[in-house]
A protein has these predicted regions:
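Thiol-/selenol-based redox modules, centered on thioredoxin-like
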Residues: 169-201
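Short, internal strand/loop/helix patches
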Residues: 137-170
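Short, Lys/Arg-rich N-terminal segment immediately upstream of the first membrane anchor
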Residues: 1-8
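Hydrophobic membrane-insertion alpha-helices, especially the h-region
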Residues: 10-29
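Structural microenvironment flanking redox-active thiols in thiol-disulfide oxidoreductases
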Residues: 105-142
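N-terminal "domain-start" segment that seeds a small globular fold
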Residues: 34-84
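Short active-site neighborhood of thiol/selenol oxidoreductases, capturing the structured segment around
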Residues: 76-115, 122
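Short acidic, S/G/P-rich loop/turn micro-motifs used as interaction or catalytic elements
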Residues: 98-104, 131-133, 182-185
Length: 201
């Protein structure tokens, strides 16, 4: 019997190590599963938000902006909207507010910079509601904005009630079309949308 004690000890140590390894694997699996569930929940919420925004996008289609709408640039210069739209007939507009989701705005600026070349940026304007020219300059320098960046009050478009950043096309006759409400959780959909819009500019 005494000779069996080392075997029992080794077996006990082996069982402890096995249980420890199993517990570690199960814990890691649970953490990974929980993260996946959280990610899926976030994406589901984003798509639910997109579905909620869709009626506002549709009701904004065809909305005509006033060509005399006053825009203010980072130097404090004021210009009517008709003077800043693309001479090529269509302008891609990115509109956001100070009250919008900051991570969304950061992601959108990075996305615009990564997929728009110099030619495409000439057909882009960014509209926000920073009424202080200094804040506009900080924004321009922070995100290295090379396209038109302007401050403007509410445009009166239904989609503004959603309180989320959005993109749309502005035609030369001031008609709005192709609205898309963008969320940071759906960056791939936003990129696909922007690439499709670029073909129309």
């Amino acid at each position: 019997m005494p000779k069996q004690k080392p075997h029992i000890l080794l077996l006990s140590v082996g069982l402890v190590l096995l249980f420890g390894f199993t517990a570690c694997v199960m814990a890691k699996t649970y953490i990974a599963y929980s993260k996946q569930l959280n990610r899926m929940a976030v994406i589901q919420t984003a798509f639910e938000n997109m579905a909620f925004c869709r009626p506002y996008e549709l009701s904004s289609e065809g909305f005509c902006l006033s060509p005399t709408t006053v825009l203010t640039d980072a130097e404090g210069k004021k210009s009517p909207l008709s003077e800043v739209v693309s001479a090529h007939g269509r302008t891609l507009v990115y509109r956001f507010s100070r009250m919008n989701c900051l991570p969304c705005i950061v992601m959108h600026f990075k996305l615009l910079k990564s997929i728009l070349d110099d030619r495409a940026q000439m057909g882009l304007i960014i509209l926000c509601d920073y009424h202080n020219a200094r804040d506009l300059r900080i924004l321009r320098n922070t995100y290295e904005v090379s396209c038109g960046l302007y401050s403007v009050d509410r445009l009166g478009i239904p989609i503004e009630d959603v309180n989320n950043p959005y993109f749309f096309i502005l035609t030369q006759d001031m008609r709005c079309e192709g609205f898309f409400t963008a969320f940071k959780e759906t960056s791939q959909q936003t990129e696909n949308f922007l690439r499709a819009l670029l073909e129309k500019l």
